């Protein structure tokens, strides 16, 4: 008889989010088309705390109130997930119907949704008192004043409407990772100057961001990823930055790398391949040339996978 649940063999202890799942007994995957009764029976038999579901039917969740970690594909009615008071992490591609109410998850720490439906209730997470990691696609605001979660340490966001980072300064004492992608209207980055604990910043597809003056004002940055950020005029504003260790970038208008010579803690770069750079890109330590076990690569991975 084919089991309804199988353990996920791809978890890696060096990835913090995976490590949490492993410490909870591993993540169990609901096989496509599995009988809901069998899912419940096997989950109870294995004391499952972390579940990954790809199917639409979530009705069986009501019988598994001990779940702490839930990952969903493109689900149907999200309602049964409300019956999980011990939930600490929630990840979903999206769902067809129903609303979430994150106040029913008082222990929630991680939340990430790829394609939330309109009216799906994701706003109930914005001020959640225990959320530390927040990933939002299709964020509807023009600024970040709605996001007030007091323990926020990592924010990953894409939004066709975001124009300003106003409101981000409310997280100056906690936020360490900020990743912005698909933000074509974003122009105002002035709030970065207040982010004294921010160590990782990624910006991509922000056509309105052409200067790094406001980026350079975030003086605690260790990793700056402009890997898909075209149209930046110059890396010049980064010169003299006291803490940058890794810089990833596309071509700039002035094609000058002189500022990288003036980064006292620089360990590696990842740059757009071109012979037009001055000085030559090959004169800088290239991230891809370091072996996986090298400290430079390991420390980079730790920053990228902080949470």
Stretches found by the model and what they are:
Residues 3-62, 66-79, 86-210, 214-233, ...:
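Concave beta-strand-loop units of leucine-rich repeat
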